[in-house]
Regions:
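The feature represents the membrane-entry module of six-transmembrane cation channels
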Residues: 2-222
């Protein structure tokens, strides 16, 4: 896992026409305008852990399934201040982000340990430490406070972007990242379901090194 603590920037609450919320418009936060093609949808951390936590191979469901169930909410309608955590990762399948739930298992396991104070501290990943010439440490007490809050949300592309609007979601990533307080780089060792390593002729092994070689992942890191 890699961690990158970001500075919070003013966030937009521009409505998304296709998935527009029907609640009273007076409930919408007033904020700076934003030209992101797709509104930001997020999942409450507690809901994420309830749905996917403590499962060895959780089935990662689609945006449409979670939205219909009420698990996904549009960011601009969340009242008050919140903490946003952006999950950056390399897809494990060509058509599905995590076909057997391996990455989601590692993510929820790590979040639960941080939430319970079982990890003493986290430091900024090596890439960003070198890039920004400093390190940022988040202590166990900090993580317990953040992750036990009812106002901590997760953005994960696998189920926070409508399947019919992947391109709009990709183009909106800079806006999403600006809004987030933390980025977690999810890059556990695992095997890609479809991609073949040209050297070994076998399915490619994924890790932090392959994550950094993917163009979109590098884009997110900056």
């Amino acid at each position: 896992m890699g961690f990158f603590r970001r500075k919070v920037a003013p966030a937009s609450k521009k409505p998304d026409k296709e998935h527009e919320d029907t609640r009273n418009k007076e409930d919408v936060k007033k904020d700076d305008t934003d030209d992101a093609p797709l509104a930001m949808f997020v999942i409450l951390l507690h809901v994420l852990l309830k749905v996917y936590g403590r499962q060895r191979h959780p089935r990662v469901e689609s945006f449409e399934t979670l939205k219909d169930r009420g698990d996904i909410v549009e960011y601009r309608y969340i009242p008050g201040d919140v903490t946003l955590i952006y999950i950056s990762h390399e897809w494990v399948g060509t058509d599905h982000p995590d076909p057997d739930g391996t990455q989601m298992y590692h993510l929820t396991y790590m979040l639960e340990r941080l939430k319970e104070g079982k990890i003493s501290r986290t430091d900024m990943d090596a890439f960003h430490s070198l890039l920004y010439k400093h390190n940022v440490t988040t202590t166990a007490d900090d993580w317990k406070r953040i992750l036990n809050s009812e106002k901590t949300y997760i953005w994960y592309d696998g189920f926070c972007v409508p399947s019919s609007r992947r391109e709009d979601g990709f183009r909106s990533i800079p806006s999403y990242i600006r809004r987030c307080d933390f980025m977690i780089i999810l890059a556990p060792g695992c095997t890609h379901f479809d991609r073949i390593d040209p050297r070994t002729k076998r399915k490619m092994n994924l890790c932090y090194r392959t994550y950094r070689l993917r163009a979109r992942c590098v884009f997110e890191m900056f």
